[in-house]
């Protein structure tokens, strides 16, 4: 259940109660595609850096180790030793972005695995079954994520099919939640708004899915080729037409600046591979913007990544040491940077919540954007 604790303009401060614990919003979900954060970050590490929600991938876990294996081992929470909320995406984005030789039909999608080429079928029912086997806290509806830009006629047909798929997802998850051998009988379902860069299609779709009794609503199909200005315009168009008593999730976004802009437009949930991916390449976030620790200028820099940061990395290691680790190709370099970046994001969200509580979010946002000046 979502409780709107405070609203100032469009900015929302909320609390989302789940079977696996309470989520304070706005929140950033830390992406562990295969039930682990790339960069040797464990579930215990995630707790230390104040992660509220972990996000795992339905498509990838269905291939390795297999959702049936995870179910036999007690579900994703037991499998990865994590007792806080987990959101699993539906697999739709990966099917449409990674898989080869796709055939989209009303029943679902036929495609070849990006790992071994074997033929696979996934539709709404299959996606729900996999997510039920994984026993995540929140399941995402199976949808088609179209590229931006795509022809209007195709987007209209795709959105209509995505709506029909959502109805099937809800019916199937309701059925699965009632079965005696289901691990998480209180698994939640979020629907996904699509429509490419066409505001009117987006709005109509938002109105349609808002009539369904879902646990939350996501805005999908962004950060896939459109400009930041287009993304913000679409958020502005869609959010007013989604239920205001449910969480709103902007999928796959984004930079710290993107997050601040989206929070100011009424978004509650975020996820992105960016902080971990950047960290693995030595790009780290600071209060003054992003820096590249591989640069020679950090060779003798004994200061932490970000002065005043309380993450495990900044409390114990210097920029010079981490640069040395990258140059020596030591795996520890990636781990230390990923830990820092995820802590930076999680702390940013905590600071955002505190700013909303203190009625100073707009000042906080402007101060951050000015300090980063396009560098975050």
UniProtKB/Swiss-Prot annotation:
GO terms for cellular component: cytosol. Residues 252-258, 276-280 are annotated as: RNA binding. Keywords: Glycosyltransferase, Metal-binding, Queuosine biosynthesis, Transferase, tRNA processing, Zinc. The active site is at 89 (proton acceptor), 271 (nucleophile). Its cofactor is Zn(2+). Substrate binds at residues 89-93, 143, 194, 221. The keyword Transferase applies. GO terms for molecular function: metal ion binding; tRNA-guanosine(34) queuine transglycosylase activity. The keyword Transferase applies. InterPro entries: ArchSynthase1/Queuine_TRR, TGT, TGT-like_sf, tRNA_ribo_trans-like. Pathway: tRNA modification; tRNA-queuosine biosynthesis. GO terms for biological process: queuosine biosynthetic process; tRNA wobble guanine modification; tRNA-guanine transglycosylation. It is an enzyme of class 2 (transferase). Its EC number is 2.4.2.29. Zn(2+) binds at residues 309, 311, 314, 340. Binds 1 zinc ion per subunit. Homodimer. Within each dimer, one monomer is responsible for RNA recognition and catalysis, while the other monomer binds to the replacement base PreQ1. Belongs to the queuine tRNA-ribosyltransferase family. This is Queuine tRNA-ribosyltransferase. The gene is tgt.
